[in-house]
């Protein structure tokens, strides 16, 4: 996969997510599910591809492809979408290399989701007027 498909910008787009989901609380719920998926799915995808078992990898990529457009950068969502489609036409060795290119961005997205969820769980502080 050409490296120009690997996103260079932040992977999590909170404004896009809130617009897609309708509210910060709805986005939070989706991000909690995505967080679990992004923890579990990439290692399973890598193992399946390494074993030459493309179908399970494609199914997991299909799931990720379904939610990324809601809150991820366009570049990352596009890259995963292309990889998922290529699961029906390309050999495992090709897919392994392409997934290896995208995996750091998925890890970055996971980290950004974790940070966002941690910030959103903090109690809101009001600043007292110091007059």
Label each PLM-derived region with a short phrase.
Residues 1-131:
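Two-component system phosphorelay core
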